[in-house]
Amino acid sequence: MKKFILVILIILASVATASYYYRSERISENKRLIKEATQTKELRIANIEINYFPLMFKTKVLGKNQQRVSFEHSQGLNVYLGQLHAHSTFSFEGKGTPEQNYDKARKSKDLDFFALTEHEYVWLDNGKYEKLKQISAEFQSENFLPIHGFEYSNLIAGHYVVLNTNTFKSSWGDLSPDDLYSWLKKPEQKDALVIFAHPGFHFYRKPFEFSHFKFDKDIVDKIIGIETHHWDPITFLGPGYGGKLLFIDEAVQSGWWLAPISSNDSHDYRNVPGKSRIGVVAEELSQKAIFSALKKRMTFASSFPIQLFASALVGDQQYPMGSQIPTSETLKIICDFVIPEEEKVGLERIEVLINGKVKAIKKLRTVSNADLTAAPQSTASDTRPESGRIVIDINKPNIPSSPGYIYLRIFGYKAGKLIPSPIYVAPFYLK
């Protein structure tokens, strides 16, 4: 009994500490975003050219008043928006039943999919996990995909969002990521999808978290992402554990093939849907198609709702974001987007990062949507979204050789960031 009480006290202390850290970090992050928006200068480098073409795309209304975008080079794929990290009363500190969370998500205007990923410590057991599966299935519809999973919540080794498993793994007694990784190697978990959750958020765990992205080649196909955005409007873009690179770059340079993931990490159904979105480019809205796209790293992470499709052109061959491409002398990255008018977000700047280092920055005109209403673009009344195309032309010697990777950071004016999944130069695996 004493041990149980001690564990509860540790958990409560951890939650209180994290809440305090969140509030202070949120203030400093907002200040930093505003400072960056006004002080960052353009950076131009030979052999990298950034062009921005606004007001290009039309939208059409589908389903529950969603705006779906038809991008001309999307190869028949669709962009679906959602969240993969949230909690209900099935977690120790969650508010709102699973039914309330799924119902709120399904009624939101732009969530195509939504996952409840309950903390496995203390309260989650096999009965509740089976019940969560059942509840999830009850909320599925033509326009909404409910997903269930769990958050492996190790006080020392870190938190991982785990999807597409029939069972969950308790972190009790686990001292390092090796315990989770051994479980993931079992045949029963062959379809598991795993995400590094909120790196660096719990500062007391920083010396040990993820054992700083220790690589394991046997599960590289299962650990598919890392949260680059956490809560609203916090962004965990760096510095990482070493203080020089961003968390995503530290993980990728450790050998992992990763997609950026946004996380609302809601612990209260009243906060659903929030602003953060994961964009998944898939053939259709089904669990099979969404999980297949996640496995291919065909995602983007954003701190505000947006429709986006990015791809790389190597010669005549097109590769969606997240792909592994062959080495070449020239490379073109095309990124098309539409931001809903009601978000009132203008783009502030575009950055090109190669192997974790910023190589080029383009400052954009600071705009509001009031400046972008000259051409009606939607069949929906009173809807004038900002839209545009970003084209990046990269030539040798700035195209990395294998292994290497390139990605964009796109900044909304005082609204956070979005990151399309990197383009990887194959064969990518570093280890």
Which residue ranges define each predicted feature?
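N-terminal Sec-pathway targeting helices
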Residues: 1-12
